[in-house]
């Protein structure tokens, strides 16, 4: 499972700066759920090939209302969700009573905690950190989050228990250095046909992992119990921590599934609870582990930013998507038309995803969801050969030629599969990285239409074909040199 790192500390110690530094390496979800998660922000970060979730808690001022009250509202929940807690202090401001109060509380909690002294740039770091030894820590880590100094080493140490090979990967230069990181996206990973085949083999003959996600009280639990009830699977509560989703194997129409329940499967008598527990971490973990994501939306409420944030995270993770608009029963025709218009307006960027209008409570339309789930999974995992992809690429360029770049037309040579779930098409050619985004979108839509891909995002990667003779001096043979001398002599004689 993907590890979770929580940033805890009093206000203005640099938690948000470190949070932004860690999450900007990917265009990842930064979800803010006011009222539900208080002031906590959740983001996805990556070090090398390893993903993790980072939580930015609100500032804790233990000297005013007491640590217990403050943490109970925002940070205590984050600490429970986390695998590692980074307790941040300000090296320039020195030790404060708030720091001492927070440290005293953290000592009572059985959670891996690391003391991080921030803002040590431009000062004597050891002298600035000396007072913090009073907090009774075994070791501390000095960083400058604003510049990224010490951040990579800190994260390596924090994640080391979860990824034993993380430090060895760093020695091989595989871990991205977060120091003075630019805002521009990291270079795209190069994919080979061998990578694609290996990816496909892992997916074949595996049960489809289906994650049901959505904001609180949209009907996730009702839908989960409806699905399990139809399949006559025993509904049970599995023990685990608050951040663990429940994995329920099931079978439908001869196809095996693993249902990832983020809401918590309830016994039938408890389905109608009015308050539903909601964990962002649980949802993000479920999306990362799923093949297909079923996003449940409440038809009786407008599409919210939370809905879009969850959808955006699923897209960034490359997951297949099916949309279920719940509580459709009982709405009059005028309201239904308005809901459909709102869906078209706000969800136009996922026009490849099937939308189902259902009633989880009464079971209307629930059975058809699995038709779209299978279609999306099939689209994400169908093998496509190099010859087919190259032919589609040629057809696309014939219908609409690539643009000119510095007086030369971009040339696309061939295409092959680079991966599955999501499908990745790798296109080789000259100056391909100079292609404008509009033409890249054209190619993506052309491949989607030609391959009849539904329910899954598709990614296009571009690789420049290197010229083997570039920067090589062209040495002439002896016969070529004699011919050149004769030609030059003839030119001189003609001038005379």
Curated annotation (Swiss-Prot):
Superkingdom of source: Bacteria
GO biological process: ribosome biogenesis
Binding site for GTP 2: 214-221, 261-265, 326-329
Any one GO MF annotation of this record: GTP binding
The keyword GTP-binding is assigned to this record: yes
Xref: InterPro entries: AAA+_ATPase, G_ENGA, GTP-bd, GTPase_Der, KH_dom-like, KH_dom-like_a/b, P-loop_NTPase, Small_GTP-bd
Domain KH-like residue range list: 382-466
Domain EngA-type G span(s) in chain numbering: 3-166, 208-381
Residues at which GTP 1 binds: 9-16, 56-60, 118-121
Keyword match GTP-binding: yes
Listed Pfam families: KH_dom-like, MMR_HSR1
SMART domains: AAA, RAS
Keywords for the protein's UniProt record, in alphabetical order: GTP-binding, Nucleotide-binding, Repeat, Ribosome biogenesis
Disulfide bonds listed in the record: none
Protein role: GTPase that plays an essential role in the late steps of ribosome biogenesis.
Family note: Belongs to the TRAFAC class TrmE-Era-EngA-EngB-Septin-like GTPase superfamily. EngA (Der) GTPase family.
The protein's assembly and partners: Associates with the 50S ribosomal subunit.
Protein name: GTPase Der
């Amino acid at each position: 499972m993907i590890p979770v790192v929580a940033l805890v500390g009093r206000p203005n110690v640099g938690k948000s700066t470190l949070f932004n530094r860690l999450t900007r390496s990917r265009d990842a979800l930064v979800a803010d759920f006011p009222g539900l998660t208080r002031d906590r922000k959740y983001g996805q970060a990556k070090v090398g090939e390893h993903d993790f979730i980072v939580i930015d808690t609100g500032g804790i001022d233990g000297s005013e209302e007491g640590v217990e009250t403050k943490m109970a509202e925002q940070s205590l929940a984050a600490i429970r969700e986390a695998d590692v807690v980074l307790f941040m202090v300000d090296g320039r401001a020195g030790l404060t009573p708030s720091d001492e109060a927070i440290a005293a509380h953290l000592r009572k909690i059985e959670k891996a905690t690391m003391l991080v002294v921030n803002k040590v740039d431009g000062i004597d770091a050891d002298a600035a950190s000396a007072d913090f030894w009073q907090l009774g820590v075994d070791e501390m880590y000095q960083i400058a989050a604003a510049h990224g100094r010490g951040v990579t080493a800190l994260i390596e140490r924090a994640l080391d228990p979860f990824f034993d090979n993380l430090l060895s990967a760093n020695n091989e230069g595989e871990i991205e250095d977060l120091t003075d990181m630019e805002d521009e996206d990291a270079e795209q990973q190069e994919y080979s046909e061998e990578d694609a085949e290996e990816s496909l083999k892992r997916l074949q003959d595996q049960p489809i992992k289906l994650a049901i996600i959505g904001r609180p009280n949209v009907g996730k639990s009702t839908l989960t119990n409806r699905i399990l009830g139809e399949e006559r699977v025993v509904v049970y509560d599995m023990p685990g921590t608050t951040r663990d989703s429940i994995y329920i194997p099931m079978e439908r129409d001869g196809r095996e599934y693993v249902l990832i329940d983020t809401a918590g499967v309830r016994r039938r008598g408890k389905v109608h609870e009015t308050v539903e527990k909601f964990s962002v971490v649980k949802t993000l973990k479920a999306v990362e582990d799923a093949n297909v994501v079923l996003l449940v939306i409440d038809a009786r409420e407008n599409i919210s930013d939370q809905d879009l944030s969850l959808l955006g995270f699923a897209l960034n993770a490359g997951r297949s998507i099916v949309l279920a608009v719940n509580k459709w029963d009982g709405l009059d025709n005028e309201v239904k038309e308005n809901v459909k218009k709102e869906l078209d307006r706000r969800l136009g960027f996922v026009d490849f995803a099937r939308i189902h209008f259902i009633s989880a409570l009464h079971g209307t339309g629930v059975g058809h969801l699995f038709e779209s789930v299978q279609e999306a999974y099939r689209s994400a995992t169908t093998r496509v050969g190099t010859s087919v992809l190259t032919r589609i690429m040629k057809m696309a360029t014939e219908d609409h030629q690539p643009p000119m770049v510095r007086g030369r037309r971009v040339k696309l040579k061939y295409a092959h599969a680079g991966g599955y779930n999501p499908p990745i098409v790798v296109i080789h050619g000259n100056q391909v990285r100079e292609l404008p985004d509009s033409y890249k979108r054209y190619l993506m839509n052309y491949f989607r239409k030609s391959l009849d891909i539904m329910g899954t995002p598709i990614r296009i990667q571009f690789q420049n074909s290197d010229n083997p003779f570039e920067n090589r001096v062209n040495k002439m043979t002896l016969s070529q040199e004699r011919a050149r001398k004769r030609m030059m002599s003839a030119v001189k004689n003609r001038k005379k």
